Curated annotation (Swiss-Prot):
Membrane side Cytoplasmic: residue ranges: 1-21, 76-85, 129-147, 197-215, 277-281, 327-343, 388-394
Annotated localization: Cell inner membrane
Organism: Shigella dysenteriae serotype 1 (strain Sd197)
Family, per entry: Belongs to the major facilitator superfamily. DHA1 family. NepI (TC 2.A.1.2.26) subfamily.
Main localization (coarse): membrane
Upper taxonomic lineage: Bacteria, Pseudomonadati, Pseudomonadota, Gammaproteobacteria, Enterobacterales
Xref: InterPro entries: MFS, MFS_dom, MFS_Efflux_Transporters, MFS_NepI, MFS_trans_sf
PANTHER family registered for this protein in UniProt: PURINE EFFLUX PUMP PBUE, PURINE RIBONUCLEOSIDE EFFLUX PUMP NEPI
Membrane-spanning residues: 22-42, 55-75, 86-106, 108-128, 148-168, 176-196, 216-236, 256-276, 282-302, 306-326, 344-364, 367-387
One cellular-component annotation, GO: plasma membrane
Descriptive protein name: Purine ribonucleoside efflux pump NepI
Top-level taxon of origin: Bacteria
Recorded catalytic activity of this chain's protein: inosine(in) + H(+)(out) = inosine(out) + H(+)(in); guanosine(in) + H(+)(out) = guanosine(out) + H(+)(in)
Length: 394
């Protein structure tokens, strides 16, 4: 990582942090995350308005993750020599266009095109977010700047689903995306005003990113990452139809459940460093095991609102360990190739999100209401077993 930081500084090293630029990047991150998860809380009205099933509507999440997967792998090589300021502005424009296309969509095809635009911005932005932040502040301030970025992610995850549910009932799902488009416009203007020129640096070295998978335990780790995130999206994408039909929650009740989920996730993220200091492997094996049990409890007793609410809180609290835990594993196990490892990890997560949402939607439409839960629980159990048996820690 130190080599990567040095590579990204060179001639454009600075001595004073550009906090306005850092906060503009953080705001852009928050907007991307919020828009990514809006369909989760708006799935039912979107499906009804477009005349499609909820399982099919859930593919709006799938296509975003699918496009983001490819963007995260190839965007940094494609735009090597391009000024990063213009690239970030482009991503903010794509975010805005995505929201407008979705809000005016009169067909499922147009909805998917809009969500694909978001995927391009999301995957591309995440692939370069760390290096971008490192070029805005002096080396001593990098940890603080990164905490601002990931703090924005945590806040966005807390408010995205409940805010979407509340506003969707108040102004309609299309106007929710119109409001998100306004946020996109604010992103564009803030970035134009605050982000300095950040020239790209063409590289003539051949990238051997996938060679990292040949290292001992790395392939097992990536498979475990895939299964844990696929299990998450198989459940979370369809939390609205499951909770409204299985537990009988209304829109107001669902909003409170989603808010509880988000707050629990924020608390879990805050506690994750304390837990991971004790044992990374225990956290990575224990968290999916708890989630597997939670999925079973919700399948068997989900008609009870108290049980369903409790499962949502436990799920948010526990799954928060997963992304932080795997990032810790990656930086420890592949410290000499942290950027390449991060690129693969982002791609694996987006592929998992794609498959989890797609298969969960198919199961919901063709097998039954609790089938996404059973799929999620099975994947989480397999993750726990794989981590215990095959994943190596340093």
């Amino acid at each position: 990582m130190s080599e990567f930081i040095a590579e990204n500084r060179g001639a454009d090293a600075i001595t004073r942090p550009n906090w306005s630029a850092v906060f503009s990047v953080a705001f852009c991150v928050a907007c991307l995350i919020i828009v990514e998860f809006l369909p989760v809380s708006l799935l039912t009205p979107m499906a009804q308005d477009l005349g499609i099933s909820e399982g099919v509507a859930g593919q709006s999440v799938t296509v975003t993750a699918f496009v983001a997967m490819f963007a995260s792998l190839f965007i940094t090589q494609t735009i090597q020599a391009t000024d990063r300021r213009y690239v970030v502005i482009l991503f903010a424009v794509l975010l805005t266009i995505s929201c407008l296309l979705v809000s005016f969509a009169n067909s499922f095809s147009l909805l998917l095109i809009g969500r694909a635009c978001l995927g391009l911005a999301l995957g591309g932005f995440w692939a370069m977010s760390a290096s971008l932040t490192m070029r805005l502040v002096p080396p001593r301030t990098v940890p603080k700047a990164l905490s601002v970025i990931f703090g924005a992610v945590s806040i966005a995850l807390v408010i995205a689903a409940p805010l979407g549910s509340f506003l969707g009932e108040l102004i309609g799902w299309r106007n929710v995306f119109n409001a998100a488009a306004v946020m996109g416009v604010l992103c564009i203007f803030w970035i134009i005003k605050s982000l300095p020129s950040l020239p790209g640096k063409p590289s003539h070295q051949k990238q051997n990113t996938f060679r990292l998978l040949q290292r001992p335990g790395v392939m097992a780790g990536m498979i475990a990452i895939f299964m844990s995130f696929a299990g998450q999206f198989a459940f979370f994408t369809y939390i609205r139809p499951v909770y409204m039909n299985l537990a009988g929650f209304g829109v107001d009740g669902l909003t409170l459940v989603l808010l509880s989920f988000g707050i629990a996730s924020f608390i879990g993220t805050s506690l994750s460093s304390f837990i991971l200091k004790r044992s990374v492997k225990l956290a990575l094996a224990g968290a999916p095991l708890i989630l597997a049990v939670s999925a079973l409890v919700l399948t068997l007793c989900g008609s009870d609102k108290i049980v369903a609410t409790g499962v949502a809180i436990i799920w948010g609290l526990t799954f928060a360990l997963v992304p932080v835990g795997w990032s810790t594993w990656s930086t420890r196990s592949l410290a000499d190739q942290a950027e390449k490892a991060g690129s693969i990890q982002v791609a694996v997560i987006q592929l998992a999100n794609t498959c989890g949402a797609a298969i969960g939607g198919y199961a919901l439409d063709n097998i039954g209401l609790t089938s996404p839960l059973m799929l999620s629980g099975t994947l989480m159990l397999l993750t726990a077993l794989l981590v215990t048996a095959k994943v190596k820690m340093k």
